[in-house]
Design a protein with these regions (language model features):
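Serine-esterase "nucleophile elbow" of acetyl-processing enzymes
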Residues: 1-55, 70-78
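Generic serine detector
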Residues: 5, 21, 59-62, 104, ...
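Short linear motifs at secondary-structure transitions and domain/linker junctions
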Residues: 25-29, 57-61, 138-140
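Cell-envelope and extracellular/periplasmic
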Residues: 15-17, 21-23, 44-46, 53-59, ...
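Alpha-helical cap/lid subdomain in secreted, periplasmic
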Residues: 67-168
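Short, solvent-exposed coil/turn linker segments
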Residues: 9, 58-59, 166
Length: 168
């Protein structure tokens, strides 16, 4: 029996989050900063357990380099979900520990996350990054900060036949 298989764990299916600060569970001292993954358990059926591995400042690259995807791989099993939301930190060219090219390394990294889920009979779901709060002036929000990463994620979802949730 392989690690993470449905037979080795409780019957409860799990939703794993692999993401950045927009999903991270935050300490009460950072309130009102709240990640999606922090409140997500309030909106899922009780038979699902949410396993939030999201971490502030992570990109697809740094998440994998730090062993965070490996930690998910050791636990994920048949019938589980892997929600994958990155882009905010992948675009940081000034930081080689996080930066990925949208239409090459970013897409390749997303495919690694997808493969981990599928190799364990879990369901990968790609989720586009949220728009940054970058204002053009006092009233108007600028748009398009992540457009290449959103387009790359959409292409990856289509190529790999996996669902995509577009929050952009």
């Amino acid at each position: 029996m392989r690690r993470g298989s449905a037979e080795m764990r409780a019957e409860m299916n799990r939703i794993f989050w692999a993401a950045d600060s927009t999903v991270q569970t935050n300490d009460y001292t950072t309130y009102p900063q709240t990640g999606i993954g922090q409140v997500f358990p309030l909106f899922v059926k009780p038979e699902y357990q949410v396993c939030n591995h999201a971490k502030n400042g992570r990109s697809t690259k740094s998440f994998m380099d730090e062993g965070r995807l490996k930690a998910i791989e050791e636990k994920i099993g048949a019938g589980d979900f892997l929600f994958i939301q990155f882009g905010h930190n992948d675009e940081k060219k000034e930081d080689p520990t996080r930066y990925t090219e949208p239409f090459s390394t970013y897409m390749e990294n997303l495919e690694t996350f997808i493969r981990v889920a599928k190799d364990h009979s879990a369901y990968p779901v790609l989720i586009t990054p949220l728009e940054r709060r970058c204002f053009m002036d006092e009233k108007h929000l600028g748009i398009g900060a992540h457009s290449d990463y959103v387009a790359a994620m959409k292409q990856t979802a289509e190529k790999n036949n996996v669902p995509l949730v577009d929050l952009y």
